Amino acid sequence: EVLKLKNVQDIYMTINPELLAEMDLLDMQKGKYSHPKYCIKMATGTGKTWVMHALLIWQYLNAKNEETISGDYSKNFLFVAPGLIVYERLLDAYIGKVQENGQRDVETSDLKMFEDIFIPDPYRDEIFNFIQSAICTKEEIGRKTTGTGLLAITNWHLLVGEQETEDEISPLEDPTIAVKKEFPIRPGTSAGHTLNVLDNQYFKGKQLDFLANLKDIIVFNDEAHHLGEWQKADQILEKKWQKALSHIQKDKKNKFIQVDFSATPYNETGSGLKRQIHYFPHIITNFELKEAIKLGLVKTVAIDKRKELAALPLDFKVEREGNDIKSLSDGQRVMLRAGWSKLKILEEGFLNFDKNKHPKMLVVCEDTNVVPYVTQFLKQEGLSDDEIMEIHSNKKGEVKPDEWNEIKRRLFNLDKHKNPKVIISVLMLKEGFDVNNICVVVPLRASSSSTLLEQLIGRGLRLMWREPEFTEIKDENREKLLIKKEEPDNYLDILSVVEHPRFIEFYD
């Protein structure tokens, strides 16, 4: 807007041309970098959604009120999420949280609750009228008639015509996959092909074309590290999410502005000592997790260094016979006991401050088949059915829509209820799980991916003790942990990660 940048290379040429010597110039000539494109690197829990709000309001009010059309602003906005939880979180932000009656209450939306922060008095009616008329859920894109702009929220699967629940199954495992690809479907309720279903399938492609035909648009990609390239043999390939964005951008040039948000905007190649991190070239700001911890914007992370963990092998996978799971490994049992022990200490300690604050433990398994074994073990340790919540997902960490509705119901106001105490998941809760009371994380996995580790920690970073009367206590906690290297007097807004000591290097 100020520098009149037209593409990613312009950022370097305008601010620091010398940096181009360190960049892959051929890569920067790709179409996905040929328009205004920016990446905001922010630690989880530090307000990425709020930055989106501010950018949207600034853009919309300028586009609506500028005397001479400059082409620098837009009234069309597309928010793209990597999955159902982040998608629901974005809907919460703009049209309010789902209440126990199943309806959304706009009074609980971010913009309504914090209107004093985001919107000057003279413009409030303008902004709220725009949101009410322009908002489109993923099912409404291209169907709903909006006012003078668009505020569309979707997951990337819709843009590429995929169901989010499709497993990665080969045609050899299920021949009907090949049949569906080769033969057209016909209406018939017995096969599940009602006219409504066929209509929805038809509109999947239409929604992408509708967005492509807009004269201008601003796209906000949440958890945008999923946009990174992937390597197959000696080929570097674009992911489907990026291909869909390129289709929308194709004829817009600099009338297409892309803003990516992620705590981990990079690709990883290699493994072990050969692991390399390749940061996205369009990162323009970096707010690190360690800075957020120092400022008290998120919980302080503490690694549980237990001698019994250090003595165990590093591989924390379940014990198997072929492909069949035999049992949890000794290391996994030790970690679960350590996590449960820590949670009980927190429950007792928190009673001294507020009996209505209930700490939770998040267990992340290597795959969904391990979840029942974790549940069985925790029951043997004394937990009841009500104290445990399982979230099952497919091979890609995704949940079927009908199951997601039940999960969403149980997740509603999870912070306010004593039970469940333990949430067991695979990848589903990796992103967008905005629960404040996760105080213990037990990662039962062998992967040491930097991206995965930071995303897992992110599930427990959101502050639980936000009230002003606890500020001084939390300041003392951070000083003892971070500076004096001492045990704190209490565990207010401290996230305990039960981890093998050899993984600590990644957290450092």
Residue ranges with predicted function:
Residues 1-508:
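RecA-like P-loop NTPase motor core of helicase/translocase proteins
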